[in-house]
Curated annotation (Swiss-Prot):
Domain of life, source organism: Bacteria
Classification of source organism: Bacteria, Bacillati, Bacillota, Bacilli, Lactobacillales
A Pfam family matched in the record: YpsA
Species the sequence originates in: Lactococcus lactis subsp. lactis (strain IL1403) (Streptococcus lactis)
Protein name (Swiss-Prot/TrEMBL): UPF0398 protein YfdB
Protein family per UniProt: Belongs to the UPF0398 family.
InterPro entries (alphabetical): YspA (IPR010697)
Length: 174
């Protein structure tokens, strides 16, 4: 696989409001293991959409892995105004999404709901698969994007769920 889209729950979805929460270290350890597998299979691009939570933690891990693996990181934002109203600590995270190998904005500003569909279609057409932290038993708006991914038989979808995190937690405590 050449390009992998990263998506998943936000920190709000997960009830994580502090980066020092033990759940963050469990999630990041799981991300590291999964990304290393993808990279060792030849992954060349990791693509983000610029969301907080899972995506941001995956971005941190990916940037660390760039010292040992040869791959590129890109962020494709929906709008140039993405995150402009975030608080100061989240602005730092937004800046991290912009300090990657490739940054693109699908649209300048929001004009209509159809832009979200066009944006989703664009990122799916320009990636070969996705690594998504999503558990079908804990639905969020991600449900629709995951369904859209699964409709395309040529699109690889790798789901990370709460069971995977439980396994990581148990390994950490052995």
């Amino acid at each position: 696989m050449n390009s992998l889209l990263i998506m998943g729950y936000t920190s709000f979805d997960l009830g994580i409001f502090n980066e020092k929460d033990i759940k963050v270290s469990i999630i990041k350890k799981t991300i590291r293991r999964k990304l290393i597998n993808f990279l060792e299979e030849g992954l060349r691009w990791i693509i983000f959409t610029g969301n907080l939570g899972f995506e941001y933690w995956a971005l941190e891990v990916a940037k660390e892995l760039q010292t040992d693996y040869d791959f590129q990181i890109g962020t494709i934002f929906s709008f140039e105004t993405h995150g402009q109203n975030w608080n100061e600590s989240n602005q730092v995270k937004l800046a991290a999404f912009k300090q990657v190998d490739f940054v693109k904005y699908a649209f300048e500003t929001y004009e209509s709901p159809s832009q979200f569909r066009q944006y989703n279609d664009f990122i799916l057409e320009n990636t070969e698969g996705a690594f998504v932290f999503y558990d079908e038993e804990n639905e969020t708006k991600l449900k629709y994007m995951v369904e859209k991914m699964k409709q395309n038989t040529n699109y690889e979808v790798y789901l990370l769920d709460f069971e995977d995190l439980q396994e990581t937690f148990e390994e950490m405590n052995e």
